[in-house]
Design a protein with these regions (language model features):
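Catalytic/RNA-binding core of pseudouridine synthases
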Residues: 1-186, 191, 196
Length: 196
């Protein structure tokens, strides 16, 4: 079977932990270009955080014109959340920057609180994100020590399921079905569990 990279194909890859979506794309582009003996036109549909793993869809040739359409499809994520602690990047890239009481948190309270996130919501992307500000990625601005404020954006969350909750460790695993542009770390960072 001959693959026509110029006409285009879609290549779903399992993006590894610690690799940016762009670096994953660059590596596959290099391999394809080497195999073809020339430069392969490629792009990726959507962006996964460097610390996220999962399916990243790459497109070649004429299929790159479908990237915008592909990004409109619903996505599904599974996230492990440590309740009672946060970091400046809302993930494990930085050390814990603040802690909060957790004695009042129950599975019932979590289920009740999660309902406020279902539907169309406004979400402020994390400053350590791939959002571009004046042509520069927000995480590059932050890593240069500069302060940045991002504007809220409308996102859609269709479903949130509690996969597991470990009350002793205060760890929560969620499955989230959502639309384009949803930042999962932000969704659970703003999961305010009120004290009684």
């Amino acid at each position: 079977m001959t693959i026509n990279f110029k006409e285009g194909i879609l290549i779903p890859i399992d993006k590894p932990y610690g690799v940016t979506s762009f670096k994953a794309l660059a590596h596959i582009r290099y391999l394809c270009s080497h195999a073809l003996g020339g430069k392969a036109k490629m792009g990726h549909a959507g962006t996964l955080d460097p610390l996220a793993t999962g399916v990243l869809v790459l497109a070649t040739g004429k299929k790159t014109k479908q990237i915008e359409t592909l990004q409109q499809h619903t996505k599904e994520y599974v996230a492990t959340i440590q309740l009672g602690a946060t970091t400046v990047s809302y993930d494990m890239e930085h050390p814990v920057s603040a802690t909060f009481p957790t004695e009042h948190i129950t599975r019932e309270l979590i289920l009740e609180t999660l309902q406020q996130f279902i539907g169309e919501i406004e979400q402020i992307p994390p400053t350590y994100s791939a959002v571009k500000v004046n042509g520069v990625r927000a995480y590059d601005v932050r890593r240069n020590g500069e302060h940045i404020e991002l504007k809220p954006k409308h996102v859609r969350i269709d479903e949130i399921e509690v996969v597991s909750f470990d009350a002793e460790k205060m760890q929560l695993v969620l499955r989230v079905v959502c639309g384009k542009g949803t930042y999962i770390p932000v969704s659970y960072t703003h999961l305010t569990l009120p004290t009684t």
